[in-house]
Amino acid sequence: MLRRFFLCGAAAVLSGCDKLGTTASSNAPSFRAVDITGAEYARQLDLVDQNGQPRTLADFKGKVTVVYFGYTQCPDVCPTTMSELAQIKKSLGKEGDRLQAVFVTIDPERDTAAVLKAYMAGFDPSFVALRGTVAQVTAAAKEFKVFFAKAPGASDGSYTMDHTAGSFVFDAQGRVRLFVRYGAGIEPLTADLKTLLGSS
């Protein structure tokens, strides 16, 4: 399953790489993650958070924001990603107040507002979870070039979710800058986030 995740993540990145040639600068910072600055996607996100408040990407301007698409019943990739973000936020100390994690559920049928609220609280109370109707979530995933699909579970009627395993990083001005592949490691991501925090 992870192989599929990586392939989908790579496809999401490659689809934006051909946009970079016209926007890259010789003075641009060097990142460990994939630099997608200037990508013509991941520009809109219009869903509702775990407290029932409508949210858009504009709400997170002023902070370096990491957006991740996943689901709460994910057994490995999703909790690992959110746990790493919580560790990074804590390690940044006061600077961590300018880092915002946003979790977008791809399983709104099971991930109710209450479920998402409890899930985020298990990592960091400042983390935001977003949900919508299946149609709204599908539209959001399409905007970010994120793949997801139901997969049969171990028992009758149960299911898991196949999905792109990676995060999108926005700078404090609200511009998408990086795609971070799952498994990239805490240290490289921390370094990239510090670079963006330092330039904001």
Task: State where each predicted segment sits.
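Thiol/disulfide oxidoreductase modules built on the thioredoxin-like
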Residues: Q136-D192
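Sec/Tat-exported extracytoplasmic proteins
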Residues: V64, Y71, K89-G96, F123, ...
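A short acidic/small-residue loop/turn micro-motif
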Residues: G16, G62-K63, G183-I186
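Short loop/turn microsegments at loop-to-beta-strand junctions
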Residues: A42-R43, T65, T164-G166
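Structural microenvironment flanking redox-active thiols in thiol-disulfide oxidoreductases
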Residues: T80-A140
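A short beta-strand-turn-helix
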Residues: L45-T65
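Short active-site neighborhood of thiol/selenol oxidoreductases, capturing the structured segment around
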Residues: A58-P79, L85
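N-terminal targeting signals for export/organelle localization
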Residues: M1-Q44, V48, L196-S200
